[in-house]
Each structure stands twice: as structure tokens, then as C-alpha cells.
């Protein structure tokens, strides 16, 4: 087409980069498409140098990532019982409490985490009053470590102490285990920092009544295939992070036979059934350790750039990468953007909190929002947004989950295998849907919404990976 012909034709413009020109095009009613292009790695010269160095190892990285994906995807994980944490969680010592997210000292912890720790100290009987518990926590006598350092995960505050019951999940393919506490339900619960007597009594009931019954029941039915439940639930409107209605119902359907066969009083059996039945979030504490057990099978694969952990402690967000020697890469956690319960505002919320982003790391949760359109009523946005997030995550992932498919997207598999390189190059961050805790201990959940990891977590990991490359 000759350039003079342009003046007689209708203009159709593609705008690349700066969105400011788009406003002028709108005013002039010119048909246009905006391409949100940004330079690789945001134009950061040091990151581009790191990417150039990494590119020299491309074949080894591709092979390592393929192996990592294969190990995680082939992991068959079963719930095999409920036990006291001190009897099964590796290296969990007396006077030790585990928490969500990366390493942090007690003095720097967020309000909900401190509140939950005080509750755990009272539950363990290490102190008699809240004041004594707070002094003990500050004294240095108790050791605090991340759940992830002990093959465990915990929602929100993620507090795990020696006498707490945990679900025991076993990776039958690779022989590793993962652990998670029992979900207490909603309202005033330990994971949001509540530590009143009714909270502690519920925890005691879980230990004395619920745990032994469920342990026997699960053994009677030969364990529970958690992967199979997640696969079904995603096709029934769940994403198995913030929406677990179908998954919890499917789990109850699996275990009710074992419960009725168990040698416990009828009243105790009914209480256990009702506890699960009334708590639609029960399955979260199974989907999380399922993801942990399968992702741990993909740890420590040399040259792999795939993320094995995303976790938050209410102060910092931390990630781990398969080929980065179990190092934590941290940055200040973001605030969650979403919907608040009546009476609360953004000024009430703590920063992003919890180990539950392990679900997104495995390719469910926020990555599967397209399968759970009803969740937008809980976290905000539109159904179209949920579908788009599930599609967009393919741009930063190495592979897909053939087992977890999204019906509204013609059964498209969820994206899986967050690739450090793709995140830094594209400036696209993983999407996480999550609950919001009040910044003060004991108040509880104040809303839910969406959040991203800080970009800096990935840039730090990229530089570390590049600096430690060797043949």
C-alpha cells in the first residue's frame, strides 16, 4: 500500500508500550489495540546480564526443568493418618514452634502470628496466663522455625507445636511425607491469632477426640487419594485454596465409611462427621500438604529454575527454587487487594500471610480460578478476570497439570511450574487468592482478595542462580 493511500483509509492503530497515547486515540475515536509491552527484566542491566549468562546453560536448564515437572506431576500422594506432630514431624523438638513463611524472629512477627504463638504456648501448658506466655515467647527459650523447614505447611499464621495433631500425607511415588494441622473452621481460630479459652478447648478436642477416631478411620479405608479429590473438585467449582466446598464434601464421602466402622462411641463419630460437615475449609489443610509433598519431590534438581515454595509470614514473602540449594529469597510482603467484611477496611489488614500459596505453586488455587467462578464473590473482580488469570499463568510456567482441568476453558489444564526466568523476563507475577487477617491478634479474618509476590523475590533468586552456575 502506498503511503498516500493511508489518508483515505480508516486508521487502525497498534500502540506499543506507553498507555498515555491510548487516551488520545480514545478521544479521537480511532480503532486501536494496546500492547502492554515492557523491556525484558524491566530493562535492568544487571538482570539482563544474569539472563544472558543463564542462556548459556539453556539445554541443561531445560532438561532439569523437565525432570522437575516429571517428578512433581507423577507424585501420587495419600492421606494415611493423623498423628501428634512431635511423633512424626522431622526435627520438631520440645519447646519449638513452627510458623508460616520464611525465617523470622519473634520480635519482628506480625500481630496474628504472635497471638497464635501465645495460644500455642498455653495449649502446650508451657505457661498458665497470656502474660506468662508472651514473656516466654520473648525470652528466647522457645525456638521458632518455618514449617517448610520441617516438611510441613500451615495456613495463615501456620502455627504448629509438638502436641498438635497433624494430617500425615505420604508420597507413594518418591517416599517423602508432608504434614499439616487440622483446619479449625472460620471465625475466632488460632491461625488468625485468636487464643481464648474456647479456641484452646477446640484444639484440645481435636487432639483427644477427633485425631484418634480419624486416624483409625483413615487406616480402615486404606488411606485417601487426595490428588483424585482435587481433580474432581476443580471440575465441580473449587480451586482448592479459598473454595473447598466440593473437595470437603468429597473427602467426607470418602471417610464416612471408615468413621462408621471405627471402634468409637456413636456420639464421638457424629461429632467428627459434623465437624467436617460444618467446615467447608476443612480440605484446605489437605490440599496444602498434598502440594507440599509433591513439590518436595522436585527439590534440589541442579539447574532447575522452577519454584518449589511461595510462603508468607505477615512481614516477608519468601520463595524457594529447585536448583538454588534450599535458599530463601525474601522481600517485604504486599497487602492483599480485595473485599472486606462489613466493618473492616484496608487499614485493619495485616500483610500477606500463610503457607497456603503452596497451592498456587503447584498450579491450583489462583491458577485454577477459572474453574471456580463463584470465588469472585469472595475475593473480588469479575468471572472474566478469573478465567484470564488461569490463562495468563501459562506465560510464566514450564508445563501444565493434565490431572487438573478447567471446564469453562474447554477443560484446559491448569498452568504449573513457575519458571523463575519467565517471571523475570516477562514481568508477569504469579496470582494468589487468599484470606486477609486482621493486623491485631485474635480478631480473625477481615476479608479476602488477590495478591502477587514481590518481583524482588524473583530478581534476587535469578541473580543467585546465575552466580552459582557451574558445569
PLM features per residue range, with description:
Residues 2-471:
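Anaerobic metallocofactor- and corrinoid-dependent redox/one-carbon enzyme cores
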Amino acid at each position: 500500500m502506498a503511503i498516500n493511500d493511508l489518508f483515505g483509509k480508516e486508521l487502525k492503530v497498534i500502540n506499543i508500550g506507553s498507555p498515555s497515547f491510548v487516551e488520545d486515540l480514545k478521544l479521537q475515536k480511532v480503532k486501536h489495540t494496546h500492547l502492554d509491552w515492557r523491556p525484558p527484566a524491566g530493562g535492568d542491566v544487571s538482570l539482563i546480564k544474569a539472563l544472558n549468562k543463564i542462556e548459556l546453560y539453556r539445554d541443561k536448564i531445560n532438561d532439569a526443568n523437565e525432570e522437575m515437572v516429571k517428578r512433581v506431576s507423577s507424585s501420587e500422594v495419600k492421606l494415611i493418618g493423623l498423628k501428634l506432630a512431635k511423633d512424626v514431624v522431622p526435627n520438631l523438638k520440645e519447646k519449638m514452634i513452627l510458623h508460616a513463611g520464611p525465617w523470622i524472629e519473634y520480635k519482628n512477627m506480625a500481630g496474628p502470628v504472635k497471638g497464635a504463638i501465645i495460644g500455642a504456648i498455653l495449649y502446650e501448658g508451657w505457661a498458665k496466663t497470656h502474660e506468662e506466655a508472651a514473656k516466654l515467647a520473648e525470652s528466647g527459650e522457645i525456638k521458632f522455625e518455618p514449617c517448610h523447614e520441617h516438611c510441613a505447611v500451615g495456613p495463615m499464621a501456620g502455627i504448629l507445636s509438638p502436641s498438635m495433631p497433624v494430617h500425615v500425607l505420604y508420597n507413594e511415588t518418591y517416599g517423602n511425607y508432608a504434614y499439616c494441622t487440622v483446619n479449625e473452621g472460620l471465625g475466632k481460630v488460632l491461625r488468625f491469632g485468636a487464643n481464648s479459652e474456647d479456641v484452646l478447648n477446640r484444639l484440645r478436642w481435636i487432639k483427644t477426640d477427633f485425631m484418634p477416631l480419624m486416624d483409625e478411620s483413615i487406616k480402615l479405608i486404606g488411606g485417601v487419594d487426595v490428588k483424585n479429590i482435587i481433580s474432581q473438585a476443580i471440575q465441580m467449582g473449587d480451586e482448592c485454596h479459598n473454595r473447598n466446598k466440593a473437595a470437603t464434601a468429597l473427602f467426607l464421602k470418602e471417610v464416612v465409611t471408615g468413621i462408621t466402622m471405627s471402634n468409637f462411641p456413636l456420639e464421638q463419630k457424629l461429632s467428627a462427621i459434623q465437624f467436617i460437615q460444618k467446615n467447608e475449609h476443612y480440605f484446605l489443610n489437605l490440599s496444602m500438604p498434598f502440594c507440599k509433598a509433591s513439590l518436595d519431590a522436585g527439590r534440589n534438581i541442579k539447574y532447575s529454575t522452577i519454584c518449589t515454595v511461595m510462603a508468607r509470614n505477615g512481614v516477608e514473602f519468601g520463595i524457594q527454587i529447585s536448583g538454588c540449594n534450599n535458599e530463601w529469597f525474601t522481600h517485604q510482603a504486599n497487602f492483599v487487594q480485595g473485599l472486606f467484611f462489613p466493618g473492616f477496611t484496608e487499614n485493619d489488614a495485616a500483610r500477606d500471610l500463610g503457607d497456603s500459596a503452596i497451592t498456587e505453586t503447584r498450579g491450583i488455587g489462583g491458577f485454577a480460578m477459572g474453574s471456580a467462578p463463584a470465588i469472585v464473590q469472595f475475593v473480588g473482580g469479575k468471572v472474566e478476570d478469573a478465567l484470564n488469570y488461569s490463562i495468563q499463568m501459562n506465560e510464566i510456567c514450564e508445563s501444565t497439570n493434565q490431572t487438573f482441568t478447567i471446564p469453562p476453558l474447554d477443560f484446559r489444564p491448569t498452568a504449573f511450574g513457575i519458571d523463575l526466568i519467565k517471571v523475570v523476563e516477562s514481568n508477569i507475577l504469579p496470582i494468589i487468592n487468599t484470606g486477609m487477617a486482621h493486623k491485631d491478634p485474635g480478631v480473625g479474618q477481615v476479608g479476602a482478595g488477590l495478591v502477587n509476590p514481590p518481583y524482588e523475590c524473583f530478581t534476587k533468586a535469578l541473580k543467585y542462580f546465575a552466580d552459582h552456575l557451574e558445569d
